[in-house]
Amino acid sequence: MQQQHLFRLNILCLSLMTALPVYAENVQAEQAQEKQLDTIQVKAKKQKTRRDNEVTGLGKLVKSSDTLSKEQVLNIRDLTRYDPGIAVVEQGRGASSGYSIRGMDKNRVSLTVDGVSQIQSYTAQAALGGTRTAGSSGAINEIEYENVKAVEISKGSNSSEYGNGALAGSVAFQTKTAADIIGEGKQWGIQSKTAYSGKDHALTQSLALAGRSGGAEALLIYTKRRGREIHAHKDAGKGVQSFNRLVLDEDKKEGGSQYRYFIVEEECHNGYAACKNKLKEDASVKDERKTVSTQDYTGSNRLLANPLEYGSQSWLFRPGWHLDNRHYVGAVLERTQQTFDTRDMTVPAYFTSEDYVPGSLKGLGKYSGDNKAERLFVQGEGSTLQGIGYGTGVFYDERHTKNRYGVEYVYHNADKDTWADYARLSYDRQGIDLDNRLQQTHCSHDGSDKNCRPDGNKPYSFYKSDRMIYEESRNLFQAVFKKAFDTAKIRHNLSINLGYDRFKSQLSHSDYYLQNAVQAYDLITPKKPPFPNGSKDNPYRVSIGKTTVNTSPICRFGNNTYTDCTPRNIGGNGYYAAVQDNVRLGRWADVGAGIRYDYRSTHSEDKSVSTGTHRNLSWNAGVVLKPFTWMDLTYRASTGFRLPSFAEMYGWRAGESLKTLDLKPEKSFNREAGIVFKGDFGNLEASYFNNAYRDLIAFGYETRTQNGQTSASGDPGYRNAQNARIAGINILGKIDWHGVWGGLPDGLYSTLAYNRIKVKDADIRADRTFVTSYLFDAVQPSRYVLGLGYDHPDGIWGINTMFTYSKAKSVDELLGSQALLNGNANAKKAASRRTRPWYVTDVSGYYNIKKHLTLRAGVYNLLNYRYVTWENVRQTAGGAVNQHKNVGVYNRYAAPGRNYTFSLEMKF
């Protein structure tokens, strides 16, 4: 049978078919109507572009501060809302752990501010038998977006640009200067912003002041934020929830053991014999069914997200002096503090009959006076006794503090008549610490009081503290030189980057102890018969005394386990040198190539830390062919690397003294080819990429073969063990409909973004065992983002509608295998759930009130659609920083329903 092939029109084809002929017609019309016009001098601030560093711009996104305002970016999750292929890594307790790009995440994606690397995600192993998967925070400090002038997001290996960590990509922030606040022709500038986000009840207030007098200038930005957890769709938390709570059995029926009677010595003032008629029976317990709102429910079946209180304060101060029109010296002082206070309400607040073991604990059920519940308890952590009258609360308090100060010298030669067009010398001293504290209370009725503590009036109350502080400090010297020049009618744009870094990493374990209020108790036994046996005729004789609070330190030193509170110190230094030359070969082609050499040396007083010296050479090469004025053909190849993190260097400790391991850098190779259509109609880019990763570091053993049998060799630990490869498609475009057809309004536009990743390969080195193949839970499901908007030509007002569609998370990306001995393997799965397809529609707009005021508003999830993103559900995956375990229901991961954002900006 003959098949009939039909050509299907879609938005992409329609755009190209209509745009290209019109563009060609416009070019001819322009050539026919050329006129000699007066010279107009226009001054404009240079904007960062996708091709500033690398000629092709493949895989890159650049957002200016104006773009961030227009997209109403108020936090890290808003930054990549409409950018498929890059996602935020949820830390599991309100914070974040960087970004995921092309199947990799956390420390495998470089994060810098003004060229200075931010803190690593340091995940320390948790205590054995606990509910936590990480003892430390595992977060990466977040950036204050009101301080940001521009952000460059690079997808694909690019260590030749950003060095260590740019294995799969990078996110580079550039902070504002006084010139970004002071308007053209003015000597001062003031900007104020007040914003509210309904999805997390977040309020942002920011004020920027800048001034210039003579050659002196200064910038000061202060930003304060506060908010709560992101609220799930209202339907996800509807109704009530029920649970069992262990309570005193006030309505105890007759029966039970005949040996349940006792008298209290302190209540028998006339002797034992006289008190036999004041018998007491052992108190007993029962499970009582309770029904509460979904907000108050605690347990694995909780429907709502854990409550969170978030706060942030940031200062950025940049004074400087223009010595003349070419030379500038300045300084920068930055301080940002962020707090994330969370209560883990997936931990049940109350005991049940499953926790209660009658008759096994001394004095169980005995009591003084009428306080029948005072000695009803269960045995908890560290053999502590915890009363049933209190509720348990588990709280995580995180404090992220960043301090940076530095100086810089900038040389800018607009005439370009010396050896350098631009040079910058800088020194930055940066310190970041993440203070993470676990507090477990059992001293208030329902467990909600974080500040309660055991005391003499609360028998069998309990408290636990566990604190980890991770700190990184850096002293970074940077030098940048740029020069544009011509040789044989070929235009060169040469840049040289040099840097030297001294760094230190420290993990401190402290405030690790238990407190338990214990009541004095004794069973009094007479010297001669009859001996009490608990019967009515011969009741037990007990003494119940005062309650004292016992504090038990858990910290140990030098035992190489989680309880080891010896500080983990790793220091070192490194340097790099990079050269990039982007060459324009007339109008037909651009080529670029770059190379970078990195050196790092580390040391530690702990001889079990895998320190050493690493040398790495990275490169990139790109070409842009321009066969037509309306089309570019692009190709890019680049490499990336990641050095072992400080946590991996410290290793996995299980009590024994470990040998150091020879950890090599992880490596990646990126190839990407694209086609770009451009003209009056806008631009459209489609590209195909292929990324290979090798020597990925994972936990496992080496193998050895003897007499035909393979066995595990050496200590367990982190080793170069995994290889992986992905491929995919990326589409990015913006259509100017007025450029397509002049009859349409000037300012009407459409945007298009699409990203798809397919796993090609994942394997384990043959000389490794008990290693799981790389699981691609970090891959974002395929996503389309379509936009239709209008901006008034004079910038008075604008409106934009964004439609996002995500495919389901592929089960193939979650499946893997664990290599065992002698060729055997176990199937592994990253997560027990995956997400279904979803879509969401957002509408946002702005209106400029007169000249100085801009009102912005947005309605997100306009149709109030209930959906769940993979980024949220991924918190239950094995690779999560703080994995959510024993999840009963997944409602808590639902995205917000219809929500609103408002902001008012003032610029003077």
Swiss-Prot record:
Keywords: Cell outer membrane, Membrane, Receptor, Signal, TonB box, Transmembrane, Transmembrane beta strand, Transport, Virulence
Database matches in Pfam families: Plug (PF07715), TonB_dep_Rec_b-barrel (PF00593)
Motif (TonB C-terminal box): 891-908
Signal peptide (residue range): 1-24
GO molecular function list: ferric iron transmembrane transporter activity; siderophore uptake transmembrane transporter activity
InterPro entries tied to this protein: Plug_dom, Plug_dom_sf, TonB-dep_rcpt-like, TonB-dep_rcpt_b-brl, TonB_box_CS, TonB_Hb/transfer/lactofer_rcpt, TonB_lacto/transferrin_rcpt, TonB_rcpt_b-brl_sf
Domain TBDR beta-barrel, residue spans: 187-908
Family matches, as PROSITE patterns: TONB_DEPENDENT_REC_1, TONB_DEPENDENT_REC_2, TONB_DEPENDENT_REC_3
Domain (TBDR plug): residue spans on this chain: 51-176
Membrane topology, record value: Multi-pass membrane protein
Motif segment (TonB box): 38-45
Listed GO CC annotations: cell outer membrane
NCBIfam families: TonB-hemlactrns, TonB-tbp-lbp
Known partners and oligomeric status: Binds both human apo- and holo-transferrin (TF), via the TF C-terminus. Forms a large complex with TF and TbpB.
Further remarks about this protein from its record: N.meningitidis cells will only bind to human TF, not bovine or porcine TF, explaining at least in part the bacteria's inability to cause infection in non-human hosts.
Protein name (database record): Transferrin-binding protein A
Naturally occurring in which organism (per UniProt): Neisseria meningitidis serogroup B
Gene this protein is translated from: tbp1
